[in-house]
Amino acid sequence: ERIKELRDLMSQSRTREILTKTTVDHMAIIKKYTSGRQEKNPALRMKWMMAMKYPITADKRIIEMIPERNEQGQTLWSKTNDAGSDRVMVSPLAVTWWNRNGPTTSAVHYPKVYKTYFEKVERLKHGTFGPVHFRNQVKIRRRVDINPGHADLSAKEAQDVIMEVVFPNEVGARILTSESQLTITKEKKEELQDCKIAPLMVAYMLERELVRKTRFLPVAGGTSSVYIEVLHLTQGTCWEQMYTPGGEVRNDDVDQSLIIAARNIVRRATVSADPLASLLEMCHSTQIGGIRMVDILRQNPTEEQAVDICKAAMGLRISSSFSFGGFTFKRTSGSSVKKEEEVLTGNLQTLKIRVHEGYEEFTMVGRRATAILRKATRRLIQLIVSGRDEQSIAEAIIVAMVFSQEDCMIKAVRGDLNFVNRANQRLNPMHQLLRHFQKDAKVLFQNWGIEPIDNVMGMIGILPDMTPSTEMSLRGVRVSKMGVDEYSSTERVVVSIDRFLRVRDQRGNVLLSPEEVSETQGTEKLTITYSSSMMWEINGPESVLVNTYQWIIRNWETVKIQWSQDPTMLYNKMEFEPFQSLVPKAARGQYSGFVRTLFQQMRDVLGTFDTVQIIKLLPFAAAPPEQSRMQFSSLTVNVRGSGMRILVRGNSPVFNYNKATKRLTVLGKDAGALTEDPDEGTAGVESAVLRGFLILGKEDKRYGPALSINELSNLAKGEKANVLIGQGDVVLVMKRKRDSSILTDSQTATKRIRMAI
């Protein structure tokens, strides 16, 4: 009916005229297409704009810069003004003319501003694409870095840098505090001097360079940013293409080196007397690629067990998921309460375990396998695993079985559980069980039990010998083709850490502990500089030897004064700790007693002070001394797989002082130069500062002109004077109020040592 009516209307010429000639004036339609700045039909708009003769508007100045007609005689701009603005209407041909004949600007800033793009092109040019393989891709969503070549500034820090570089004259408080902010700002201001590129563009590009951008993407394979930038080229739903990046980027190197540094530091801290204090000391004194590790930790979102322990120690928030057996567990539903329970192993050993009572579901994500676990109190209900290979799947199954705390798992233990950590402390029961079955899980799998399975799409069974099956499977366990996504949330929670580096959330659940730190060794991409003496041994005995002597030489001025006035404090310095492991156990105490007696004689008899000898023997005096009459002409240190000798008097391959160059070499490596001349006879005595006198500080004119060493003997006890010592330095000294004999001094030293130990 309606269509017929419409046809009738259309047959009248007036209707046709109204529809084609008159303007549309229905308010609703006008509103729809004109409200807001957003173009409602961009494709149509583009089409009809380009059909016009002058679709572009330009600044008035363009008339002076462009001819009215081009070489072909086509008009480039119209004399009529743009309605509603004072701009002129221009033809698309004007753009062509401008591109061919317009003024050129310097191209020098382009590679600097578009640095990330230029670098990407280079990486792709030098990258190698291998063959395409067709196979099922187990992809799991992980949070990945999608922006290679960035610094690690927070959004706020980057904003301040960008404002300072691009809009330096804009009003607004900008606080550039961190070292990286200041360095980047200075560098960019220099690079972008006289830059003609639109400031907004520069700002966008700077943001790409300064801020880490992450996305939650399905990935099978490499997760570093140089792989993610070619994700669309390297993996599809059923295919993958091999690819080797044509270059590395600093942000990936920082992530990789940070993990290695954190692992080394946590491992080292675990074996020291106060793990937490040691860990903090090492984090604060370590640099990675020339940047302080603590600064990197504050900015870098990498989640790895050791890195998170370091962050927790610094009071930073970390992810609320917890780690067990190298898998990251995230509870997705359910809840539990913890109760201590005693259980008996198959070997009738009693274990005290904290049992989780209640139904819970977890996702487990590891490097090479992922799983979904549903469990009740001491019972595994269901485990769905997926992984790269049989080995990886087995690892995940073992961890889940141990985590389930099932009785048949505990009964599968054969032999005693006595695993210890690096500090020789027994591991907690859950980690005891884990280590036991990681070594050999045969009995565990045999005793677990098997069940017939239903045919479910995408799932198959797995037998106790880890072979796949469509008929039977380990009780509750299935293998899936699909991976389990990593936990996507980036929420961070406040945690606490105890002195043994166990990290807990606010409910007291343990999220991390040193047992969870991987033992994998890698080679860092960026130089890691550990200034802490605790890390000297990381490169072996030789490095300990060289570092110890370098430390003494670097700090000789203060060491020298302590040597003469408060030797006990000097001997207790932690810098001498690593050295003790090089001295044969049986000889440590004897060497120490011998060297301390020798030093005491040097302090007592003027003129026998010998800088080189003190430096050489000092590390040996740090061990608790044994009082014996033993004399030694050489002391043994264990390096290069055997005992090497340090001569008490004279040079040796281990310790060689060159008088001519005043340089010390240890095992052929340069250990530094001695600033003072050790052979000036009494000058040496002066610089050791005489026994019976206390150095009070710098010269004080109130106490008259500087005396020579010989004039000192006239001072009364408690009297102060300025003295001229070795290098023409003048210091203020005071004669001690009581004469301390050798005997009392050595006795108090020994007593103090005993107390300190």
UniProtKB/Swiss-Prot annotation:
Q: Name one GO molecular function term.
A: RNA binding
User: In chain numbering, where does the motif Nuclear localization signal fall?
Assistant: 735-738
Q: Where is this site: Avian adaptation?
A: E626
Q: What is its main location?
A: virion
Pfam families per record: Flu_PB2_1st, Flu_PB2_2nd, Flu_PB2_3rd, Flu_PB2_4th, Flu_PB2_5th, Flu_PB2_6th, Flu_PB2_7th
Which GO cellular component terms, listed alphabetically, does the Swiss-Prot or TrEMBL entry include?
host cell nucleus; virion component
What GO biological process, any one, is recorded here? Answer: symbiont-mediated suppression of host mRNA transcription via inhibition of RNA polymerase II activity
InterPro entries membership: Flu_PB2_2nd, Flu_PB2_6th, Flu_PB2_C, Flu_PB2_CAP-bd, Flu_PB2_middle, Flu_PB2_N, INV_PB2, PB2_helical
Q: Which SUPFAM superfamilies match?
A: PB2 C-terminal domain-like
Localization of this protein: Virion; Host nucleus
Key words, A-Z:
Cap snatching, Eukaryotic host gene expression shutoff by virus, Eukaryotic host transcription shutoff by virus, Host gene expression shutoff by virus, Host nucleus, Host-virus interaction, Inhibition of host RNA polymerase II by virus, mRNA capping, mRNA processing, Viral transcription, Virion
Function of this protein?
Plays an essential role in transcription initiation and cap-stealing mechanism, in which cellular capped pre-mRNAs are used to generate primers for viral transcription. Recognizes and binds the 7-methylguanosine-containing cap of the target pre-RNA which is subsequently cleaved after 10-13 nucleotides by the viral protein PA. Plays a role in the initiation of the viral genome replication and modulates the activity of the ribonucleoprotein (RNP) complex.
The cross-references to HAMAP family, in alphabetical order and at most eight, read:
INV_PB2
Q: Please state which protein family the record places this protein in.
A: Belongs to the influenza viruses PB2 family.
The entry describes its oligomerization and partners as: Influenza RNA polymerase is composed of three subunits: PB1, PB2 and PA. Interacts (via N-terminus) with PB1 (via C-terminus). Interacts with nucleoprotein NP (via N-terminus).
Q: What is this protein called?
A: Polymerase basic protein 2
Q: Which organism is it from?
A: Influenza A virus (strain A/Silky Chicken/Hong Kong/YU100/2002 H5N1 genotype X3)
